[in-house]
Structures are given as C-alpha cells and as structure tokens.
C-alpha cells in the first residue's frame, strides 16, 4: 500500500477539454472520469480569484481531480475562467470581475449536460463561490458547495434569491478564514435559512496541508456520494 500524498494521481480517464461561451470565448479545462463504470455524480469546480493566482490547478481542485474519480466514483470538471492560464493552456478573454464569468459557468454547465454527466454539484472556492452564488440560481444543479466563501461580490439580494428554490447549499468555512470566519459567515448567510455551515477547526482560507485537504474533500464527498466515506488514505 502507498500513502496518498499531495502529488498523488490516482487512476482515472482524463481528457483535455474545451468549450465555447455565449460571447464566443474558448475556455480550456480537464474532465476526469472514473476508470470503470458510470460516475454517481459530477463536480463542477469554480476556481479562486484569477488576479490572486487562482486557476484550475489550485491545489484543492487539482487534488479532487486526481483522487475523487478513483476514491469516490465522482466525475470532476475543472477549467480556467476567461483570461486565465495554467499548464493546460490559456482561456480566451480577460478577467470579468465575477460578472462575465457567468458565461463561463454557464458554458461549463452546458458541457456537463451535453456529455450526459449526472448529478452536477457546483463547487466554488473563494472567488468561485461568488460566481456560483450570483449566477447559479436559475440553473438546474444538484447542489452548491462553497469553500472559504468571502462574500465580497455577493449582495444580500443575491443570497435571498436562493430562497426561491430548494437546492442544497453548504458552506465549508475555516475557523481562521482571512475574509469571512464562522461567526460572520453565520450572520451573513442567515438570510438563507436552509444553508448549512460547516466550521472546520484550525482551518485556513487556502486549506494548506494534507489534513485540511482530506477534510475538504471528505465534506464534498459527504454530499455527493456519502457511501464512499471514509476516504482511503492509502492506495495499491
């Protein structure tokens, strides 16, 4: 047996993908599928702030793609928002301040639908949570998972729109978050009574370290495929 570490890449069917937004931009990404059988669910990752170095390889997103198809039978779609570069390539366009990224999210969700991938959960991290909260309300998604939500670009009105549907929403909030620690998160999110807040003891905004990584991935799997828990820490 081998211990799962930061750079571990478990077996999956990985494909470089691209899709086009409604305003004509080509975005680049990767789709990772379970090696055998159909996935039980799909994660659509929305990455952290591009102007602060966020991209499709931000470590939690990369590790989810590297592990969860094998460990939890989950498909993972990750991509670069407009104007963002990673080793996969550069998406067309320029940073849209969380506004134009609506079209990026919609193009990614459309790609999931066209591929027939099941049960799409939107997973935003930091800036990605703002894109999800502001732009996913009118779309048919299985749920939202918000990692380290800062609520910098999300108004009370945008939050209240989530009361018009019954989509499950969970916010995974680190105890020592730099922008929205748990007490403030409970206050800000109170306008959406069904929203579940999970406070992660000793957690920080960037979820650095294997302990925090495993906790975050476990909270995601708990919503999408709880039968896969606990996540293995070793592989053959």
Which ranges hold each PLM region?
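Catalytic histidine neighborhood in serine/cysteine hydrolases
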Residues: 190-206
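Catalytic histidine-centered segment of alpha/beta-hydrolase-like enzymes
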Residues: 203-215
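Acidic catalytic loop of the alpha/beta-hydrolase fold
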Residues: 152-153, 175-180, 205-206
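Short beta-strand/loop motif that positions the catalytic acidic residue
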Residues: 164-166, 171-173, 177
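Gly/Ala-rich beta-loop-alpha elbow adjacent to hydrolase catalytic centers
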Residues: 124-132
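An N-terminal hydrophobic leader/cap segment in hydrolases
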Residues: 1-21, 25-36, 127, 233-236
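Serine-hydrolase catalytic machinery in alpha/beta-hydrolase-like enzymes
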Residues: 20, 25-33, 38-115
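Short alpha-helix in the alpha/beta-hydrolase fold that links the catalytic acid
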Residues: 157-159, 180-190, 212
